[in-house]
Amino acid sequence: MNKQLKEFQEYLPKCRKIIALVGAGLSASSGLPTFRGSQGLWKNFNMIDLATPDAFYIDPGLVWQFYSWRRYGALRAKPNKGHYALSKLSHKFNSDEYITITQNVDGLSSRSGHNLDSLYEIHGSLFDLKCTSFMCNYVDHNNFKQPLTKALEDTEFEYSNLSTRKRTFGDSDGNDGVDISLSPQFNPVKTISEKDLPSCPVCHDLLRPGVVWFGESLPLNLITEIDSFVESDPSVDLILVIGTSGTVYPANSYVERVRLKGGKVAIFNTDIEDNILNGKVEDTWGFKGDAAELLPIALKPLIGDI
């Protein structure tokens, strides 16, 4: 057992209040692509460009094909040992003592049996749908129907055939190659009429994915509840930063607020700064590698075996 793990496991049982901050790195261990690097393309479109209100306004059929593909992938994926470790941890504490803040929209945390009272999906869920009409407040939670309409059924065929078309290419400078299996350029995007897309059963306007797109605000009610958890007494003893760098808002703000109140930070990620790994950052532990494998080991004093 290395020094950092020993110190962390000695501190963990003393904690009265814990936050787990979860990013895309944990879901990557379940086989889901991230929006970054060589996994950032879908049909030669930058995924980030499709995850915007403007993209949906310009071509809702294109955006719905992308999200139908993501929904199908998330349904095929299974929670990994990291998800189950956090699930067990959530049942060791009350919801005023422990929360998981996930930036993922794949639903894997909830499917792992996590205590829903202590789970905050701040970027929404692929399996929530909401009406686009300003005058309508219809929301459909936990809709796992796939495909949502007949026009979107081809996404299943594409996902199931990725392995047969997998190859990579890179540029002459040796930069990361692009995995064509995540960018199926040989199947051009279909043009889908709005009448063939998911529609609101109340007002018959278009439905959209219930996720927070780039440029949109995070849900105020969730952020308010999280802020209350962070600021209330007793102070947070520990924040687990899992599968994310924790350097982007609001993740970075939670880390810094915990530090300011005397709490400690434990990072589980494939990319961690050397000064953290070497124990040179005060009150911070770094565990480099696959968070799905590291979490069950690190949390064992509280959760036992997975």
From Swiss-Prot:
* Residues annotated as signal peptide: none
Where does this protein chiefly localize?
mitochondrion
User: Record's PROSITE patterns?
Assistant: SIRTUIN
| Sequence positions that bind Zn(2+) | 131, 136, 200, 203
The positions annotated for binding substrate are 67, 70
| Keyword hit for Metal-binding | yes
Which residues are named in the active-site annotation?
123
> Where found?
Mitochondrion
Paste the cofactor note. Answer: Binds 1 zinc ion per subunit.
What keywords sit in the KW lines?
A: Metal-binding, Mitochondrion, NAD, Transferase, Zinc
Q: Name one GO molecular function term.
A: protein-succinyllysine desuccinylase activity
CDD domains registered for this protein in UniProt: SIRT5_Af1_CobB
Residues spanning the membrane: none
Output the HAMAP family linked to this UniProt entry: Sirtuin_ClassIII
The extra comment attached to this record reads: This protein may be expected to contain an N-terminal transit peptide but none has been predicted.
What is the role of this chain?
Answer: NAD-dependent lysine demalonylase, desuccinylase and deglutarylase that specifically removes malonyl, succinyl and glutaryl groups on target proteins. Has weak NAD-dependent protein deacetylase activity; however this activity may not be physiologically relevant in vivo.
**The name this protein goes by in its record:** NAD-dependent protein deacylase
Supply the source organism for this entry.
Answer: Candida albicans (strain SC5314 / ATCC MYA-2876) (Yeast)
Classification of source organism = Eukaryota, Fungi, Dikarya, Ascomycota, Saccharomycotina
